[in-house]
């Protein structure tokens, strides 16, 4: 029994869900998301509640059931509240700037790195060393934040680099002299 798949998704006020042959469109105050799901999972909308049902209890169906429910719930949360990831930069001279929708990063290279914001993603800079990536799609927000982090991931000796806020970076000792 998939415990996640059996949970009911409650639609918040202002969120509409349309299911057209397992192509689900979710509209809300922050925007609209569309995704195609497996035809094996039946999606039922009853008022403000959405339930998912699977045809049998095979292992494959259970995994698809739980995954579909989680993806659908992320769509509902995204169009109603949105998602955001915060990154912090540590290092001498490491800073970020916004040029329109482009994020320009100075992270100790001979040239600045430029990151174009994908569709539906916004960058905010509360200060020059903090980056906030926000949008309605959890998947795209996470991928964009991971890409920004990959431009200079934290190194274990001095801890310099771009990291998620609250991320623990394990530190190593340097070489011991003679």
From Swiss-Prot:
Keywords: Ribonucleoprotein, Ribosomal protein, RNA-binding, rRNA-binding. It comes from the Bacteria. Pfam families: Ribosomal_L6 (PF00347). InterPro entries: Ribosomal_uL6-like, Ribosomal_uL6-like_a/b-dom_sf, Ribosomal_uL6_a/b-dom, Ribosomal_uL6_bac-type, Ribosomal_uL6_CS. GO terms for biological process: cytoplasmic translation. GO terms for molecular function: rRNA binding; structural constituent of ribosome. The keyword Cell cycle does not apply. GO terms for cellular component: cytosolic large ribosomal subunit. Belongs to the universal ribosomal protein uL6 family. Part of the 50S ribosomal subunit. NCBIfam families: L6_bact. This protein binds to the 23S rRNA, and is important in its secondary structure. It is located near the subunit interface in the base of the L7/L12 stalk, and near the tRNA binding site of the peptidyltransferase center. This is Large ribosomal subunit protein uL6. It comes from Streptococcus pneumoniae serotype 2 (strain D39 / NCTC 7466). The gene is rplF.
């Amino acid at each position: 029994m998939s415990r996640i798949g059996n949970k009911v998704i409650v639609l918040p006020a202002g969120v509409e869900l349309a299911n057209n042959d397992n192509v689900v469109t979710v509209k809300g105050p922050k925007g609209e998301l569309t995704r195609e799901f497996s035809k094996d999972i039946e999606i039922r909308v009853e008022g403000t509640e959405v339930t998912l049902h699977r045809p049998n209890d095979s292992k494959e169906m259970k995994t698809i059931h739980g995954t579909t429910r989680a993806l659908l719930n992320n769509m509902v949360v995204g169009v109603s509240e949105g998602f955001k990831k915060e990154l912090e930069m540590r290092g001498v001279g490491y800073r970020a700037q916004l040029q329109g929708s482009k994020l320009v990063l100075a992270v100790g290279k001979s040239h600045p790195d430029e990151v174009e914001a994908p569709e539906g993603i916004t960058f905010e800079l509360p200060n020059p060393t903090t980056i906030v990536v926000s949008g309605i799609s959890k998947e795209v927000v996470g991928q964009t934040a991971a890409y920004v982090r990959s431009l200079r991931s934290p190194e274990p000796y001095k801890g310099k680099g771009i990291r998620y806020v609250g991320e623990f970076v394990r530190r190593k000792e340097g070489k011991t002299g003679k």
